[in-house]
Amino acid sequence: NLNEKQLFLFKKTSELCKKVGLNSTEIALYESDEINAFATGPSKSKSLIAFSTGLLEYMNEDEIEGVIAHEIGHIVSGDMMTMTLLQGLMNTFVMFAARALATVIDNYLDDEDSGFGGLSIWGYWILVWVLEVVFMIFAYMLISWFSRKREYAADIYSSGLVGKDKMISSLESLKKSVNQILPKENKRDSIVFSKISNSKKIYFFQTHPDLDDRINYIKNN
C-alpha cells in the first residue's frame, strides 16, 4: 500500500506530465536512503522518472514538486538523448584523434631502419592509449560543461512550471541533506554529494553546478 507522500508523488507527477503533454511517461520509486531523482529513456514518448525513497522521506510536498518539474524539464528538452549522442560523438572523436596524432608522431619520428616507422608496434599502441586518456579528460570536461548547462535549463523550466519558490526550496533542501544524513565516510561515494560538491578542484568534471550557483541563477532569471 502507498503512503500519503507516495500517493502525492505519483499523482503530482502524472498531473504535471499530462500538463506538458507527456502522457506516457512512467513513474518509478526505488529503495535508497539517498535523496535522488533522475529521468531516463530514449524519447519523450518512452521516458521514465525515478525517485528514491530517501527523497520522499526528507522533502516536503512543495520540494518534491520542484524536483518532479525539474526532471520533466529534462524530458521535454530531450536531454537524455542529447547527452547519449554527445558522449558517443566524444568517444568516436577521442579514438580517431588519438590514432591520427599517434600516426603523425610516428611518421615524424620515422627512420629508414625501422619497419614500423619511428615507433615499434607496441610503442605506437601505448602512445594511442596515452593520447586517448588525455583526450578523454578534455572530452569529459566538455560533456560535464554541457550537462551543467542542461541542469540550469531544467531549473528554469521547473521554475516556470511550478514556481521559483518550489524549485529553490528543493535545492536548499538538497544542500542541507548531505551534512544531516550522510556519514562522513560515505560522502565520497554518494551520488548526492557528487551533485552538490563545491570543490573547485573538481568543478570542471562536475555534471551538476554548485547548488548556490543554481539558486542564484533561478533568482536572476
Model regions: which residues?
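Residue-level recognition of transmembrane alpha-helices
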Residues: 84-88, 129, 182-186
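Peri-catalytic and regulatory segments of divalent metal-dependent proteins
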Residues: 1-72, 76-81, 182-188
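Hydrophobic or amphipathic, alpha-helical segments that drive membrane association/targeting
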Residues: 1-34, 40, 92-149, 175-180
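Basic, amphipathic juxtamembrane/active-site segments
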Residues: 79-95
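Active-site-proximal gating segments in proteases and membrane effectors
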Residues: 19-46, 115-119, 144-145, 158-221
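Bateman (tandem CBS) regulatory domains
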Residues: 50-52, 135-140, 201
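Phosphate-/nucleic-acid-contacting segments
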Residues: 154
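Alpha-helical hydrophobic/aromatic positions enriched in membrane-embedded helices and signal peptides
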Residues: 62-63, 124, 202
